[in-house]
Amino acid sequence: MGYFFRGAIMTERADRGAIILAAGLGTRMKSERAKVLHEVFYRPMIAYVAGTVLQAGVTRVVCVIGHQKEAVQAALAGLPVGTAVQAEQKGTGHAVLCAQAACAGLTEILILCGDTPLLRPETLSAMLAQHRQHRPALTLMTTKVARPYGYGRILRAEDDGVAAIVEEKDATKVERLITEINAGVYLAEAAFLFSALARVDTNNSQAEMYLTDIVAIARRSGQQVQPFFHDQPQDVLGVN
């Protein structure tokens, strides 16, 4: 199956890569089909996401697969995308680590989920440009929604950077009133990313490695976490 791109490809950089997380079971879909294989206008969601990343000028794209991995690979046929396997579901942080070898030589790594088919290449391109201008350890895409229930809330620091992401179950009553949320798109300096992931533990209710923990690790080590605010929340909606 061939795929079309939405618009022109942005400026490419050989040192810039992306990791697309697509190994999950998608249990909330209550479907036998892997979540990223569900179609939007007759195309699997994962194909939209991979195409968007490529259009944003990212030349090395690695899709982390696990559940129904052969079918996900087939959905990516025709796109210049590599794969890495997460054999066991040990969390989003662990999924990124599964792609570490495939990211050798990269200086910047974009991380996003495979269930965001409405994300636009120009949005990612703007995020990449902001990151390159300021060079924080981590840039985190945020947005605001009227009903933030279920999303990780963004706590801002005094310097207006991101101080932390607080998940719904851990938020106080005051924190639950925050409408700025984690959009689930990260752009990290590669050296920081993998050193931070080496410090992420599994001391949580799910006994998993959470990618979101790298925000607190960056702040504790005195490194900057910069928000990239996107004012169109519908673009970053995930599918459940």
PLM regions and their residue ranges:
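Short glycine-enriched, charge-decorated loop/helix-capping segments at active-site entrances
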Residues: 33-39, 200-203
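Rossmann-like NAD(P)H-binding beta-loop-alpha module
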Residues: 143-174
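Conserved N-terminal catalytic core of the sugar/cofactor nucleotidyltransferase
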Residues: 2-17, 44-129, 133
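His/Asp/Glu-rich metal-coordinating catalytic cores
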Residues: 109, 114, 122, 141, ...
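N-terminal nucleotide-binding beta1-loop-alpha1 segment
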Residues: 9-31
